Amino acid sequence: MKSKLIILLMLVPFSSFSTENNFEINKTRVIYSDSTPSVQISNNKAYPLIVQSNIWDENNNKNHDFIATPPIFKMESESRNIIKIIKTNIKLPDSQESMRWLCIESMPPTEKSTKINRKEGRTDSINISIRGCIKLIYQPASVPSPVFNNIVEKLKWHKNGKYLVLKNNTPYYISFSEVFFDSDKVNNAKDILYVKPYSEKKIDISNRIIKKIKWAMIDDAGAKTKLYESIL
């Protein structure tokens, strides 16, 4: 009996993204501006992989604004391949960035096809599928590349009752690599991972007295900026 297990891995702020067990992506984000972008994936295992690439929106639905090609292919062991991102004719906002997710899923072929025994006397098996997702950010021609020292002035933090409110007055998706409340690093920062253009986020800070916020952003190359500070 065979079952399929999908493990989903999201973005981490490093120069490349590795799923540890299956494949490596050479970027943590894709910026789509003038040219057709691409990512390189590497199969460092001793057996081939079946790889599938798709574009998803922020609500975890398949998206048709972009196409990842090739959509499905086989990677031999110790090999590399390129996935290109192509924009369709669907119109996107031209006054701000738009974001999707490029998700790449891999699964080893059956043992019969690879001639590699990965079981020890078992009659059932589980095909483990690993999915790695990185941000795909569309930057229209009318929106210049971000200058992060200038962006800081347009990110506003303030308290409103039991909430800490972050307002993004820029046309950019702002991603954070780390956030500090006073001197305490926020470890469970899922609500502050990123903020959309011209929007705000509310973070519940019930029973906390916070006087200042420190934060570092992630730039277009996937690198961490310096720490910035706001007094509340």
Swiss-Prot record:
A single BP term in Gene Ontology: chaperone-mediated protein folding
Subcellular location: Periplasm
Gene3D superfamilies, per database record: Immunoglobulins (2.60.40.10)
The keyword Chaperone belongs to this UniProt entry's keyword annotation: yes
SUPFAM superfamilies xref list: PapD-like, Periplasmic chaperone C-domain
Keyword check for Mitochondrion: no
InterPro entries in alphabetical order: Ig-like_fold, PapD-like_sf, Periplasmic_pilus_chap, Pili_assmbl_chap_C_dom_sf, Pili_assmbl_chaperone_bac, Pili_assmbl_chaperone_C, Pili_assmbl_chaperone_CS, Pili_assmbl_chaperone_N
Top-level taxon of origin: Bacteria
PROSITE patterns named among the record's database cross-references: PILI_CHAPERONE
Any Pfam family hit: PapD_C
Function: Involved in the biogenesis of the CS6 fimbria.
PANTHER family for the chain: CHAPERONE PROTEIN CAF1M, PILUS ASSEMBLY CHAPERONE
Name the record gives this protein: Chaperone protein CssC
Species of provenance: Escherichia coli
